[in-house]
Amino acid sequence: MLKYIPAIFAIILSSNIAIASKNYDYISLTPLRHVADLIDSHITNIDHLFNNRLTFYESSSLKSKFITKDKQYIIVMEVPGFDKSQIKVKLNGKKLFIAGNIEDKNKANDSDNYMNKNFNYVISLYEDVDQKSISARLKNGILTIILPRIEVKEQDSREITIN
């Protein structure tokens, strides 16, 4: 049953995104809200069944900010409970990959407990990011990624005649 929780959770997130969209009128949202409420109540019941061990459901996504300044972009993410060894920041082309994973297998009092907490973000970088100077730091559960900006030369443009 636990392997279906992320899929169910993704459905809830999709429903919330659809509800927030301006393209939907209020009347058409009623079925989506009903489905989201049903799924939410079932997950709450499952959580009670497992003695409130499904804490990952409560913290659905990480809080993050993207800040634009004159000389740099700054990504700030709240990643409570993660340490440096559990977070990877990789650059591949013009994409920045940020991933975190915690696995905790605990055997105590004749019961097996297992906890897995993870996140994955992919960010497409602007042309003016100095990819060689990107840095990251983790302090007090806050991951800060600094993306220095460089001046990008405008490409020469010319008009092409049509024959």
From Swiss-Prot:
Disulfide bonds: none annotated. Residues 55-163 form the sHSP domain. Keywords: Stress response. It holds the Pfam family HSP20. SUPFAM superfamilies: HSP20-like chaperones. Gene3D superfamilies: 2.60.40.790. Belongs to the small heat shock protein (HSP20) family. This is Small heat shock protein C1. It comes from Rickettsia prowazekii (strain Madrid E). The gene is hspC1.
